[in-house]
Structures are given as structure tokens and as C-alpha cells.
Regions:
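Compact, charge-rich alpha-helical regulatory domains located at protein termini
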Residues: 144-228
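Primarily recognizes the serine-hydrolase "nucleophile elbow" in alpha/beta-hydrolase
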Residues: 1-43
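Short beta-strand/loop motif that positions the catalytic acidic residue
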Residues: 44, 49-52, 56
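Conserved alpha/beta-hydrolase "acid-adjacent" motif
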Residues: 57-66
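Loop/turn elements at helix/coil->beta-strand transitions in domains of secreted/extracellular proteins
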Residues: 12-15, 45-47, 74-79
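Alpha/beta-hydrolase-fold catalytic nucleophile elbow
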Residues: 17-20, 51, 83-84
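Acidic beta-to-alpha connecting loop that harbors the catalytic carboxylate
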Residues: 54-57, 85-87
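C-terminal catalytic histidine-bearing segment of alpha/beta-hydrolase fold enzymes
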Residues: 72-141
């Protein structure tokens, strides 16, 4: 149900914690009309915290893995913990729900404190009369943002003529050597460009030894370009 709320509901939660979830077609074994939530993951899916065990004999761990793959494809932030062994339905692993002789990794209970820490990263923490600023954004990159930025992927900006023109103005064009602050920027071959296409532009510029203040200048110019999708 949590996975369905995160991927399908009209009013979606701001974050979801999914424990050994049934997310794929296996759910049909429980209810013939139940949805396959993996296929419903989209850009509006909220950040997710997922935990499971490798040896779950009731819900195959591939439910969690394929759901995470869908989150990656949709650029959604998530944290996951797949522990080495343990039964299905371990809950918090407290003695009220698990007997002392249950065969389960001693680290499984960590998901409780880890998920709380993750929620603080997503929502912010309590401090000085208010909430601190979240450090984990809903999307890993800015590819779906209203405007371009250096936190879009390198390949995405390359595909936007206006955006790439800005970057070229600072780098001097891919494949050329250029000095920045007395240092030579590394030459980018086609192979390197292909490999780097999924990296954030910010990371590429840092790799090229571009000073932070110059990176911010690039970002300022990109932020004036609407992200036409």
C-alpha cells in the first residue's frame, strides 16, 4: 500500500518507507486486481526508503531491486538496505514480534534508526525554533527542473543548444585544451563524453579544475534558460 501511495495516489506522501514490499507482478498472487507499482514509478514519485532481506522466502528481493531500478530511471532519491539474511515480516525485530531464536542478521534492526535519519535528511531536522534545510532533494539531478542548472546531467545540458552554448563559452568546447587559472583543463574525448553524460555538469566542471566562483557564473547563466522538455 505504501508503494501504491508513493506512485499512484492523487495526493502523494512527501516520503515513503517500504519494508520488504511487494512491488512487482508478484502482488497478483495476493490480489488479482492489485497494481504493479514498479511500472507506475514516475517523476512525481516521492523519495523512498527501502529495506528487505536477501533470503526473504515470501516476497522475493527482486521486488525491491526492480523498484529501485525504476526509481533510478525516474531520477528519484532513495536509500536502500538489503540485509544478508532474515525472514519475511520481521518488522522492527523487537522481541514483541520476533522470538529470540529467529535466524536473522543482527544488523536488521538498524533500519529503524537509519530510516529516521533519512527522514531528517529529506524533511530537515528540528533546531533553533524551526526546521533545518533538507539535504536530500526529491530528485537526484535538476533535469526535471523549471530552468537549467549545473546540477543537470552533462548529457542533458549537451542536448540543449542554449545550455550547451553557455558551457562552451566557459570550457572552450569539448575535446580542446584550455587553461583555467593557470591549469590545463583535461582533454575530453568522445569516449569520455559518453561516459560522463550521466554525471552532473557541476562534477564535470570541477573535474576540469574550474573555480567554484566560475561554476556559479555558469549556473547563473543556465538558470535563465527555461528547461523545455
Amino acid at each position: 500500500m505504501a508503494a501504491a501511495a508513493a506512485t499512484m495516489s492523487k495526493n502523494r506522501p512527501n516520503a515513503a518507507i517500504l519494508g520488504y514490499p511487494v512491488t512487482g507482478s508478484d502482488v497478483k498472487g495476493c490480489c488479482a486486481t492489485a497494481p504493479d507499482t514498479i511500472s507506475c514509478v514516475d517523476k512525481n514519485t516521492c523519495p523512498c526508503f527501502i529495506f528487505a532481506t536477501r533470503t526473504d522466502a515470501v516476497v522475493p528481493v527482486m521486488n525491491s531491486i526492480r523498484f529501485m531500478e525504476a526509481l533510478v530511471q525516474a531520477d528519484i532519491s532513495f536509500e536502500s538496505h538489503i540485509y544478508s539474511y532474515g525472514p519475511h515480516g520481521f518488522s522492527t525485530c523487537d522481541t514483541s514480534v520476533q522470538s529470540g531464536d529467529t535466524t536473522i542478521s543482527s544488523r536488521v534492526p538498524n533500519w529503524v534508526s537509519d530510516s529516521i535519519g533519512w527522514l531528517k535528511e529529506v524533511f530537515g531536522d528540528f533546531g533553533n525554533g524551526g526546521m533545518t534545510k533538507p539535504v536530500c532533494k526529491a530528485h537526484v539531478t535538476d533535469n526535471d527542473g523549471e530552468f537549467l542548472s549545473v546540477d543537470c546531467t552533462f548529457g542533458y545540458v549537451m542536448g540543449k543548444p542554449e545550455g550547451w552554448k553557455v558551457v562552451e563559452g566557459f570550457l572552450g568546447g569539448a575535446g580542446k585544451q584550455e587553461k583555467l587559472e593557470g591549469q590545463e583543463a583535461p582533454q575530453m574525448t568522445l569516449e569520455m563524453i559518453s561516459m560522463a553524460s550521466g554525471m552532473k555538469l557541476r562534477q564535470i566542471l570541477e573535474y576540469a579544475h574550474m573555480p567554484e566562483e566560475v561554476i556559479e557564473q555558469v549556473n547563473d547563466q543556465l538558470s535563465m534558460i527555461p528547461n523545455q522538455r
